[in-house]
From Swiss-Prot:
Name the UniProt record assigns to this protein: Purine ribonucleoside efflux pump NepI
Reactions the enzyme catalyzes: inosine(in) + H(+)(out) = inosine(out) + H(+)(in); guanosine(in) + H(+)(out) = guanosine(out) + H(+)(in)
GO molecular function, one term: purine nucleoside transmembrane transporter activity
Keywords for the protein's UniProt record, in alphabetical order: Antiport, Cell inner membrane, Cell membrane, Membrane, Transmembrane, Transmembrane helix, Transport
Membrane-crossing residue ranges in chain numbering: 22-42, 55-75, 86-106, 108-128, 148-168, 176-196, 216-236, 256-276, 282-302, 306-326, 344-364, 367-387
Family statement drawn from the similarity comment of this UniProt entry: Belongs to the major facilitator superfamily. DHA1 family. NepI (TC 2.A.1.2.26) subfamily.
Keyword match Transport: yes
Residue ranges, Cytoplasmic side: 1-21, 76-85, 129-147, 197-215, 277-281, 327-343, 388-396
Amino acid sequence: MSEFIAENRGADAITRPNWSAVFSVAFCVACLIIVEFLPVSLLTPMAQDLGISEGVAGQSVTVTAFVAMFASLFITQTIQATDRRNVVILFAVLLTLSCLLVSFANSFSLLLIGRACLGLALGGFWAMSASLTMRLVPPRTVPKALSVIFGAVSIALVIAAPLGSFLGELIGWRNVFNAAAVMGVLCIFWIIKSLPSLPGEPSHQKQNTFRLLQRPGVMAGMIAIFMSFAGQFAFFTYIRPVYMNLAGFSVDGLTLVLLSFGIASFIGTSLSSFILKRSVKLALAGAPLILAVSALVLTLWGSDKIVATGVAIIWGLTFALVPVGWSTWITRSLADQAEKAGSIQVAVIQLANTCGAAIGGYALDNIGLTSPLMFSGTLMLLTALLVTAKVKMKKS
């Protein structure tokens, strides 16, 4: 109880939201996401320039996710009492350094080192995002602030691949990463200007991160997070083969579907704060239930292009509630240990993304075209049931 009081005394004193700081965090998160996925659209020229296969070059994305998973788990144990403002500045420096190392890479090993630096920044920043947010705004404004941050994520996910592809043709892949390094420098200056001092956890309050899982409802919550994100990646990773073969979309048609998905996701994120103010638990249970029904509809009637497009829009709109909702759950139910809870959450999501994509791919190759949808829908239904039965939610 003393830890709760100590960590929230500063938060309780906040009467006016620091929106400049919130937007600086959102901008930094967006830059991290864009740089994370830049290689997806630049894979071919990167591979040709470095004299490696595209499959090997693709490991530049894998190593980032792998390092991010471990960074998220151990970052709070490492930084302890360090002022979080300085830690965030360090992450922005790592983002900039990563872009420069990749830009000047003349070997695959240097490329991986650069991408590993990004993984450290990505995992650490994501682990701290919820706890940072709740220290920048009053408690009643936390859902809105989180929706700003995840709105930036939605925009980044929509523009990362096409922006990288367009600029890569225009100025070359190395200069794309140089431009990203400039964004990193902007992050550094904006954070220095807007983010206040945020003292870390005193050493005498140090607590093992994994002890949080012993609290009532926390393990159930993390399992629900795992299943919902695994279900998402089992579906979304293979949306191209499913939509092109099941519904008969052309490449141009699929591009429009993905654009619609991205716009719907942004709208869903923007509306999430209004929904979460009414009931976080209802949102966390209702969203996966809607997604489970959507997966069933796509499995049964996905050959109709109108139905398939509608499902993509509903999916983007609905899943947008999930990351904002779970971050809100952490800020309310685990407010005294939000940073450590965020560490576990990020690691669980990274693992879920990997497992969901792997199992979905195996199902697609060995069972059938609609099998990733059935797997995804099953996970979403189980998530809804688990949240309803086991996940605890404290009122704000």
